[in-house]
Amino acid sequence: YNILDNRLKKSGWLQKLSDDAVEVHVRSVFLQGLLLMNKNQRPSYFKRWSELWQKWHSWLSLRNITALEAALWFVLQEDLIDNVVVGVDSADHLQDILDALGEYHNITVTDFLSEDLNLIDPSHWKF
């Protein structure tokens, strides 16, 4: 579940799980780090979505927030999600995540949602 992929919500499963009192933990909020990469870091496989990436970085710049803040707060605002699971590479990375939680950001954008499995499902990625 992330700013590009809300299939769990769109399908109605997120609400159903909540209605059934199932605690929901989501992961891949950074889409395997893809949402945090700048243009030069992103593997060439993702160039076909260059318009989306340009829109993403412009949107971040316009709102003066980081990709980390946007990715985290988009998911944290979802009332039906109980916990967010993140992976970290280092103590510094963990600190960056904790720092991003310091200031609330209202992230309700849906302009980036995609149903393209070649983008939103890492098992489809080809390098």
Located regions from the model:
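Beta/alpha (TIM)-barrel catalytic core signal, keyed to glycine-rich beta->alpha loops juxtaposed to Asp/Glu
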Residues: 1-117, 124
